[in-house]
UniProtKB/Swiss-Prot annotation:
Residues 1-8 form a propeptide. Belongs to the tospovirus envelope glycoprotein family. The record marks N459, R460 as: Cleavage. GO terms for cellular component: host cell endoplasmic reticulum membrane; host cell Golgi membrane; membrane; virion membrane. This is Envelopment polyprotein. The lineage of its organism: Viruses, Riboviria, Orthornavirae, Negarnaviricota, Polyploviricotina. The cell attachment site present in these glycoproteins may help in the adhesion of virus to cells. Residues 343-459, 1066-1110 are cytoplasmic. A motif (Cell attachment site) lies at residues 14-16. It holds the Pfam family Bunya_G1. Residues 1-290, 460-1044 are lumenal. It comes from Impatiens necrotic spot virus (INSV). The gene is GP. Glycans are attached at N46, N92, N186, N566, N582, N957.
Amino acid sequence: MALKETDAKIHVERGDHPEIYDEAYYDRSVDHKNEILDTLAEMLQNATGKTLRPTRDTQTVLANNEVPQSSSGLSSTPTTISIMDLPNPCLNASSLTCSIKGVSTFNVYYQVESNGVIYSCISDTITKLGNCEGSSELPRSFETVPVVPITKIDNKRKLSIGTKFYIIESLENYNYPIMYNSRPTNGTVSLQSVKFSGDCKISKTNIVNSYTVSLTTPEKIMGYVVKREGSDMSHSIISFSGSVSLTFTEENMDGKHNLLCGDKSSKVPLVDKRVRDCIIKYSKNIYKQTACINFSWFRLIMIALIVYFPIRYLVNKTSKTLFYGYDLLGLITYPILLLINYLWSYFPLKCKVCGNLCLVTHECSKLCICNKNKASEEHSEECPIITRTAEKNKKYNWASIEWFHLIVNTKIGLSFLKAVTETLIGFLILSQMPMSMAQTAQCLDSCYYVPGCDRFVTNRYDKCPEKDQCFCAIKENSIVESNFLTNVVTEGPMDCIPYQECKGRITENALVTFVKCRFGCEYASIFQSKPLDNGFLEYSGDTLGLNAVNLHFMKRLRNGIIDFYNKTEKYGYISGDALKSNESDIPESIFPRKSLIFDSVIDGKYRYMIEESLLSGGGTVFSLNDKSSSTAQKFVVYIKKVRIQYDVSEQYTTAPIQSTHTDFFSTCTGKCSDCRKEQPITGYQDFCITPTSYWGCEEVWCLAINEGATCGFCRNVYDMDQSFRIYSVIKSTIKSEVCISGFVGAKCFTVSEEVPSESGYFQADILADFHNDGLTIGQLIAHGPDSHVYAGNIARLNNPSKMFGHPQLSHQGDPIFSKKTLDTNDLSWDCSAIGKKTITIKSCGYDTYRFKTGLNQISDIPVQFTDQNSFYMEKIFSLGKLKIVLDLPSELFKTVPKKPILSSVSLSCKGCFLCSQGLRCAASFISDITFSARLTMKQCSLSTYQIAVKKGANKYNLTMFCTSNPEKQKMIIEPEGDKSYSVEALVDSVAVLEPENIIDQNDQHAHEEQQYNSDTSVWSFWDYVKSPFNFIASHFGSFFDTVRVVLLILFVFALAYLCSIVATMCRGYVRNKSYKTKYIEDTNDYSLVSTSSGKDTITRRRPPLDFSGI
């Protein structure tokens, strides 16, 4: 009996739908070009329409797309076959049986059945797919903007704008045939996260609206989106060509959004639109700015005051008439009333006689707070609202109607009910009130090579022609160009890249020789082995600094092909990302102020001991005072970040299985060994079933009973968009990024618990108080696509245990641990009488990704991997103490004896003016003495106005905010206490770097807004209130700020006491009508009183006053 081919097809069940796959064709022993030709040959059909499986031992593959001679003998010469001449079932999906297997943001993965064979296809369009099963999931159209995959997990949270099916051609040992946009190739399918790609320029528009930017691109189409980190933006992509204006909404300006456009990313800074509009409208007028910014509060207060008095009068007048309403409201709020009255007996600031509120002085009212009896000491002992004793509580039942009426009618209860009524009426009233061209190669004059086209073209290039439009011949000593359109021949000197001897690596022809001449051997090799379908002519890659080779691979990524994961990760870095440069290093306006007193004097230096809690965002502004110095000197310590650095080792990557590709072969007779002759063992995920030919399960022309075998393998399609990388923890170290500013300049540095930081005048060290965060040495952690770290039950490498961590892959999706052979629990098979056999794959290898729900998220803050071996995890709690030792020479606090001499003065700046980022300046000079100095400069404000100059070389980092370019302007260095000794430093150079960030970078009002925020901050106001007590507090050393607070509290109480006395006297004077009562001075004298009739009365005059004793 002869072995016979079967039209086997595969039925794969995954999720809630079946998946069908075609036979795999395999010949992986030849190079990449021959593999594609092998696939094309297998698609040829014979005259009967039967698909033939070619015999590996006899098949011959010819160069230049030639196929072997036909077995029928009809042709005696090789025939050149074009790809377009081959039958392509993927393009005929509308007339064939097809099924949609996966839909991404940019393409679709579907399969078509033709003559009993299933073909896998990927397409960027939905043309002719309307009749396919599952077509209801298709969108109206796919996005056509250029994108490239994101293989670096850290970038997915910020840059991902959707998903796309890709073909990975680098995994040669696991490839299978696939068609992408009708182009056949061998590879593996993978679903990847993607980001925009392309040349895009982001610039601020010079119009009145300061929230509008302009986006410009030389490409035919480009995409942009304003994305909040971690959000899904696949349905918010906006495409454009040329240029477009974008106006940010108030929601976009919350400091958590990024503008993504092509290869660039720009963070939308935090901007309060209401504040910025007022700053611009009322520039340089802080009172109008304050009124404008807080207008809503002023308006609310004014309306509330206008509404309050009429409502108050109405409620007081109707409280007795509408007592039923108050009873109903009291019944609703009875628990609250009961609690308030109960707690009042324990309130310390109440009068012991009448029970009313008493702060300092108090005049008792006629009625007690219970509003029932007269106020007296005897009644206060009986009043249940004032006194709480066990005997009195027994007399009252809190659920009785008597107790209810008592609680409702107390002064506390009645005031509460009136307040609730006033609030409800107020809300009711207020609610009704209105409120370039891509990289090309030129021969000599008008003949070019353009990526994506395998023909020589002229400068009239529109699309890739069918034949050469010109020709470029590389000779030994010259280059000859022939233009077929103009019949002009030009000869020029040999100017190729030297030393490009690569004949053994490439197949030479005229075009390849020319490409090697202009770009070198490496590019010529990939040009021949990895062609481009679409050259993306307008894309230059200048933003990412791509050379010819890297630009070619980037365009391959745009075409849906991943060649090398390592190169792809390098392309993941985004240009123009001003995320860090926008953040102010030291936001000192929100820090508390302290006076710093020296701890000791060592070798003529004042030693200051500073201790700060190791907490992110904390800091202190220290003032250094000395009797000999005229002004206090400022020293700012800012703990910018506190985080734990974990050193890890990468174990593997795991990802969910999106679908499965299966190939198998059936024999009528024989065993597995016979089947394996046609379907060799691949090394993993192989299977073989025998017998598969028996009564009721035979194929046509097969009469065998209890014979035959079905063997094959399966390959998974992984969803790398949801991949996790598994690491093992090796080591943990606490690190802190600390910034200092003040008279020692401005700089940021990193302090580790292992290595202290020492520079200039200070030394910084960490006293760690590590909190256990659940991560231990040797523990496995998972880094997810959301940039968070997870811990839990995770399988170790090469461990088949049923825990999260399978399938185990390399970071590029290459299986590194899997089953060699599938057992009976992993698959099932079925057949029909005189029909086709089907294989159902239950599980193609280990799959435990669903167990990710059992993992625990370690931190709410996303982590950032610095490389594959370490990452940082920020902490929101204190990790210990930061200790700084500051040693300052005593000369800094003394008046200089002479005018200092500065030499080798250098002052250079770079950055922008009229922007919030400012100019970052580096100053250096050599001084002959040590002194403290003040800095001033016209048209500029400085990050620090005081510096400490030491004898010898000095270097400082300063930030200047200027209204104009300060180049060639003078900075005045004024020694402490004597302006006559001032020296000047000239600004040597200013490199203006206008960042491509937006809104506040080119805004002339940015500095004014910063100044307003600083002047109106809570800390500034609090410091202003305490300032009258600075003189007294300065005598208490390090308790300076504490003494100021204590004195302020005492002053407030004294003022309240005085005001209370004055108010009591005035109230009594008015209440007793003393201003109407005459004072009758009657000591020993008397007056004649009139008789009852009132007649004959004589009044005695008062004797004259005697002033002799005065």
